[in-house]
């Protein structure tokens, strides 16, 4: 899995990069054929937003989440992506 992290109005520190990498590594337990991941972290006034696009076998998955801090936004994003990956895996098994 290739992971690309970009920040808009936020500096991507080493701690933040490690946190994102660890969280996205856990997504492989839901679907093991994740090819590329694009993560965009944004800060707009008081809103912290995280967006991600996953290129997986059989399609593309996108999710976005907001939080009071960047770590909460990333946690919300991972929860949404885990649900979507589970649904995607079930769809592929049905065919």
UniProtKB/Swiss-Prot annotation:
The domain of life for this entry's organism is: Bacteria
Q: Which UniProt keywords apply?
A: Translation regulation
Does this UniProt record's set of keywords contain Transmembrane? no
GO molecular function terms listed in the Swiss-Prot or TrEMBL record: ribosomal small subunit binding; ribosome binding
Which biological process, per GO, is one annotated for this protein?
negative regulation of translation
Name the InterPro entries on file.
HPF/YfiA_ribosome-assoc, RHF-like, RHF/RaiA
Pfam families per UniProt: Ribosomal_S30AE
For this chain, the family text in UniProt reads: Belongs to the HPF/YfiA ribosome-associated protein family. Short HPF subfamily.
Q: Which NCBIfam families match?
A: PRK10470.1 (NF007780), yfiA (TIGR00741)
Quaternary structure note: Associates exclusively with 100S ribosomes, which are dimers of 70S ribosomes.
Q: What is this protein called?
A: Ribosome hibernation promoting factor
The protein's organism comes out as: Escherichia coli (strain K12)
Chain's gene name = hpf
């Amino acid at each position: 899995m290739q992971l690309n992290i970009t920040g808009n109005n936020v500096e991507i520190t080493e701690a933040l990069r490690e946190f994102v990498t660890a969280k996205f590594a856990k997504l492989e337990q839901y679907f093991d054929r994740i090819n590329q991941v694009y993560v965009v972290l944004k800060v707009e006034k008081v809103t912290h937003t995280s967006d991600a696009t996953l290129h997986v076998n059989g399609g593309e998955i996108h999710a976005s989440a907001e939080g009071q801090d960047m770590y909460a936004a990333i946690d919300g994003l991972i929860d949404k992506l885990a649900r979507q990956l589970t649904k995607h895996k079930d769809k592929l098994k049905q065919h």
